[in-house]
Amino acid sequence: MIHPLIQRLTTTLGYPLLDADGLDRQVRTQPFSVLFFAGDPQRFPEALDVAVILPELVKAFPQLAPALIAGADEARLQGRYGFSVWPSLVFLAGERYLGCLSRVLDWGEYLERIPAILAGENEDLPRIPVLSPESGTPSCSPMETSES
């Protein structure tokens, strides 16, 4: 069962609930999108705070088209955007990744960081470190080799 604060985003505020199949169609039609990856609110209670903050962010940044990512597809889509902390807000220009804000921030941080994300050049997707089998040290690319 979806928590009422998260359900309110779709039922009362009309935010689309996107699955993996509908995501690309939706964001392709929007100049700027913010995707809410809530995760399980029992595991990540900050998701409920972000569910309350998100509508206020949309008021402050009306160019953002908000959407909630369906729980069944969150893990698969998380891999596309490379974040590792829940809850997360992923910002897109069309289908292009712009940035991500994870967990709950102070209101002033949102007001400072979102314009920078929207105005900036597209960020590369974050790289998830891969452990090198030879040395056990983190590497951002499986193509890198450790020197002996």
Swiss-Prot record:
Identification of the protein by name: Hydrogenase expression/formation protein HoxO
Species of the source: Azotobacter vinelandii
Family stated for the protein in its record: Belongs to the HupG/HyaE family.
Stretches for region Disordered: 128-148
CDD domains: HyaE
InterPro entries registered for this protein in UniProt: NiFe-hyd_mat_HyaE, Thioredoxin-like_sf
Polar residues compositional bias, start-end: 134-148
Pfam families: HyaE
